[in-house]
Amino acid sequence: MKNKNGIYIIGVDHGYGNIKTANCCFTTGVESSDTEPTFKNDLLIYQGRYYQIGVGHKEYVAEKVMDEDYYILTLAAIARELSREQIAQANVFLAAGLPLSWVAKQRKAFQEYLLQNSAVEFTFRRIEYRIRIVGAAVYPQGFAAIAPIVNHFTGSNMLCDIGNGTMNILRTSDSKVDLRQMFTEKYGVQQCVLAIQEALMREHHAELEEQMIHNFLRYGTVGIDEGLEKAMKLAACDYTKKVFRKLREHGYDPRIMKLYVVGGGGCLLKNFFPIDPGRIVINNDICATAKGYEYMAEVQNLAGGVK
């Protein structure tokens, strides 16, 4: 979060697996109810309804404006950032993004979605917030993570942003983005999770909670039966090989270009693929894209002129 002339720029990375801001990350899940729930740890109250944030897992949707979920999750993200500074009333400028291949077509609708209410009052974690959303910008997902450093890129480079639902790919040449070489593949981490679940059921008649699988992908082990972990590792290794196959389909050549990997899926390559650290750079900061959105909004001075 950045304070620009009394306006707080808050970057929100609306992932399919997690919502990220510059300083926090929580599961992309929300359950709504007309009645107050028993457990209230991450409870958001808005317009008379109760929303449990981080509960369940939102299904993949091609357009994030199809329901109210991402709007409610945005309010929670705003509150999480403001609470760090003990702020409950603020003018907020939202900096968000969409997958590379979709941003041109969906930018306007998503911007209007985020701006649907200029004044918003809600309660989160028992704190009442009064927010004025003074503007919003929507940027290319993935590129935002390298925006602060792209001017230092030389030669030919490829960016691979592996999220939960999608994988975004773009090429740069001498720090300039090649607009003809931007791609979005529906081949995010969730595809690896599904492959692992299938392998465990097929080979061991075993079911494992998704969170345990995500922990395995992140840390390389979860301390369960050796045979189960072996099957999980084989499925994860197969997924990473397919990631590089898709990169090659879009022109990746390790002899010519460096590869920059961002997003939560970077840990899969780190744990399950033989990485050449001289040619492949993995950014482990899951909040890098949200930070990039804030950087881009600040550089473009979008919030500075808003009254």
Where are the model-predicted features located?
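Nucleotide/phosphate-binding catalytic cleft detector across ATP-hydrolyzing
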Residues: 1-159, 176-191, 203, 210-307
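Conserved blade-register residue in beta-propeller folds
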Residues: 21, 169-171
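Ser/Thr-glycine-rich phosphate-binding loops at phosphate-binding pockets of nucleotides
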Residues: 162-168
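Acidic, metal/cofactor-coordinating or nucleic-acid-engaging core segments within structured domains
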Residues: 197-203
